[in-house]
Design a protein with these regions (language model features):
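A charged N-terminal "starter" segment
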Residues: 1-132
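Short beta-strand segments
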Residues: 133-138
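Conserved small/polar residues in nucleotide/adenosyl-binding loops
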Residues: 139-145
Length: 148
């Protein structure tokens, strides 16, 4: 954890307001979570949380949850390994999915929130003759958001 002295020093050396991220604290938290949940669980860092911590998170053996074209673009720019991307979110447009598949092929993971999304992913993958990993979740079957 950053000390008050270090924070004060950074504030004096830089203009304020100032955002300070403790990368060691991030590493400690992720390590702690991994110890608690065990090896069989994959930790995903939500890009929307803070894309400025990508470089630090890349070193922590996590996957990256990407919900928008902008977040995917950041991953591309930062050379995130495409096998570490989980394409998530309810607003995956056809052209966005096609862009990801054209750049990643069957690498990465795609989540599905509806039957229509499944059909769209299937159509895009079939057009490219690729197989994509899609985890099936039974946790939300009774929610209204799971309908077409």
């Amino acid at each position: 954890m950053l000390s008050i002295e270090k924070i004060t020093q950074l504030a004096k050396e830089n203009s304020t307001p100032l955002y300070i991220f403790d990368k060691d604290e991030l590493a400690d938290r992720i390590s702690s979570i991994k110890r608690i949940v065990g090896d069989g669980v994959t930790i995903c860092y939500a890009m929307k949380a803070n894309p400025f911590l990508l470089d630090a998170a890349k070193k922590l053996n996590v996957k990256f949850e990407v919900c928008s074209p902008g977040e995917f673009s950041i991953c591309e720019r930062e050379n995130i390994n495409m096998s570490d991307i989980v394409l998530s979110g309810v607003n995956k447009e056809k052209h966005d999915i096609e862009h990801v598949m054209d750049n990643c092929g069957g690498v990465g993971m795609y989540t599905v929130e509806s039957v229509s999304q499944f059909e769209l992913l299937n159509e895009c993958a079939a057009k490219r003759n690729i197989t994509i990993p899609v985890p099936v979740s039974y946790t939300h079957l009774t929610l209204p958001t799971t309908s077409r």
